[in-house]
């Protein structure tokens, strides 16, 4: 029954929450990667990977509530996330442990504060995931990029390491039906509907952003990522 799988999911995160005080930050990141891979295997979510990551800001497209599991299974790190996640019972403390930058998307001061933190972030030593769209895109598409990570790469000199990943099941897109769902509703639907998917991940060439190149590089990366998404993000029976 799906309820037992849902209970396992809750147990999975309760255990991770209780372990936040038992490990160093780096040890905990390694633990997260191991656990994310086990969770993916349990739900028969096969992750196919091409290429290897290089040091830098980790920039990935954002389609689904499954995205955090996928990126952590590949490379655990901190992330930029909306402030609401900080108050989630289990997710907040786990996110804080790995290093999170919180942003109030509707608050200009908050966005500016995050940009200032990004400008001081050592992305080569402390991996940080950023979804440049700032929100989830529709399955098979890619919303315009915000400039935060590109400006940070320009100001710090750190590379951007792009990752594009594509699902072969449109049901992973929580806005697919036209009704925006919250995280917990999406998780419940994942189990009730027995949603299964494969994920095709491509580590792209690292990107250097020179002075005054932020917008140009953002447009360039968006164009390249969209080619992958149009080619690989489609139902498996097509």
Residue ranges and their predicted role:
Residues 140-213:
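A cross-family acyltransferase "interaction/gating" segment
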Residues 121-150:
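Catalytic-site beta-strand/loop segments enriched in glycine and acidic/polar residues
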Residues 11-18, 54-108:
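Catalytic core of membrane glycerolipid acyltransferases/transacylases, capturing the structured
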Residues 49, 58, 79, 201-203:
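Generic preference for hydrophobic
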Residues 101-122:
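A membrane-cytosol interface segment of integral membrane proteins
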Residues 1-62, 70:
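Membrane-anchoring hydrophobic helices of lipid-metabolizing enzymes
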């Amino acid at each position: 029954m799906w309820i037992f799988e849902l209970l396992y999911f809750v147990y999975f995160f309760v255990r991770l929450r209780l372990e936040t005080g038992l490990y160093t930050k780096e040890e905990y990141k390694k633990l997260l990667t191991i656990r994310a891979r086990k969770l993916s295997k349990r739900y028969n979510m096969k992750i196919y990977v091409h290429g290897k990551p290089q040091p830098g800001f980790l920039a990935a497209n954002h389609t689904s509530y499954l995205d955090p599991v996928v990126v952590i299974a590949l490379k655990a790190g901190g992330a930029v996330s909306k402030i609401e996640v900080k108050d989630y019972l289990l997710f907040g403390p786990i996110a804080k442990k790995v290093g999170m930058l919180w942003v109030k998307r509707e608050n200009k001061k908050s966005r500016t504060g995050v940009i200032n933190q990004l400008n001081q972030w050592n992305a080569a030593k402390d991996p940080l995931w950023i979804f440049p769209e700032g929100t989830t895109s529709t399955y098979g598409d890619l919303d315009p990029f915000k400039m935060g990570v590109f400006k940070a790469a320009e100001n710090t000199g750190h590379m951007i390491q792009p990752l594009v990943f594509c699902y072969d099941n449109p049901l992973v897109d929580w806005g697919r039906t036209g009704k925006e769902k919250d995280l917990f509703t999406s998780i419940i639907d994942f189990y009730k509907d027995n949603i299964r998917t494969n994920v095709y991940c491509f580590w792209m060439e690292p990107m250097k952003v020179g002075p005054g190149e932020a917008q140009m590089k953002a447009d360039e990366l968006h164009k390249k990522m969209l080619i992958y998404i149009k080619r690989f993000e489609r139902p498996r029976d097509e």
